[in-house]
Amino acid sequence: EFASAYMADLKQFLVAQKNEGRQIFPRGPEYFRALDLTPLDKVRVVILGQDPYHGDGQAHGLCFSVRPGVRTPPSLVNIYKELNTDLGIPPARHGFLESWARQGVLLLNSVLTVRARERASHQGHGWEKFTDAIIRAVNEAEHPVVFMLWGSYAQKKAAFVDRSRHLVLRAPHPSPLSAHSGFLGCRHFSQANAFLESKGFDPIDWRLPENPAADIN
């Protein structure tokens, strides 16, 4: 994919943005952090997001996750609420999700960069094609995977996933605008673990370390 013409165009766009003095989130080394932490052959669960957080110091390459020391965003607060209801896991005091990624949870945004403080500013420049290719590769993998598709955007993006081989879980987005329409109470986390165990895989430990700094390398 990196040799594709659209990726060359995307690189040119990002270079031009930087040359114009635009600040881009996350930092360059973190564009592909989700894939660095969760290689495709290790993927057990896919959670899809849309764009990186556009506030200062938030995004670090994993959807829904924020750096240690950053206030937990509202959607992630609702994810923690559902984890508590579903599995009895107390809400973490931080929003740093790298321990999930290291266990095989691919926390993938559809678009991997954003201009600082400008929501959705890098949509339509090629990232969507790249992340479509990632989802296709996971779909074609030999081992079964759980897809957690929250909200219509994620559900459309992964509509082609083979449900005869993979577990596809759908719910409204955990945003405060929609969480009470069916995300809260969806029990996706326990369903994911039951599926993984039924296929002979270890369940995901959805608990997060108390000290997120210990999870950074």
Curated annotation (Swiss-Prot):
Compartments, record wording: Cytoplasm
Top EC class of this enzyme: hydrolase
Reactions mediated catalytically: Hydrolyzes single-stranded DNA or mismatched double-stranded DNA and polynucleotides, releasing free uracil
Matching Pfam families: UDG (PF03167)
Cellular component aspect of the GO annotation: cytoplasm
GO BP, sorted A to Z: base-excision repair, AP site formation via deaminated base removal
Matches recorded under InterPro entries: UDG_fam1 (IPR002043), Ura-DNA_Glyclase_AS (IPR018085), Uracil-DNA_glycosylase-like (IPR005122), Uracil-DNA_glycosylase-like_sf (IPR036895)
UniProt EC number: 3.2.2.27
Active site per database record: D51
GO molecular function (one): uracil DNA N-glycosylase activity
Alphabetically ordered keywords of this record: Cytoplasm, DNA damage, DNA repair, Hydrolase
Record's function text: Excises uracil residues from the DNA which can arise as a result of misincorporation of dUMP residues by DNA polymerase or due to deamination of cytosine.
Family designation: Belongs to the uracil-DNA glycosylase (UDG) superfamily. UNG family.
NCBIfam families tied to this protein: PRK05254.1-1 (NF003588), PRK05254.1-2 (NF003589), PRK05254.1-4 (NF003591), PRK05254.1-5 (NF003592), ung (TIGR00628)
PANTHER family associated with the record: URACIL-DNA GLYCOSYLASE
UniProt name for this protein: Uracil-DNA glycosylase
Organism: Sinorhizobium sp
Gene: ung
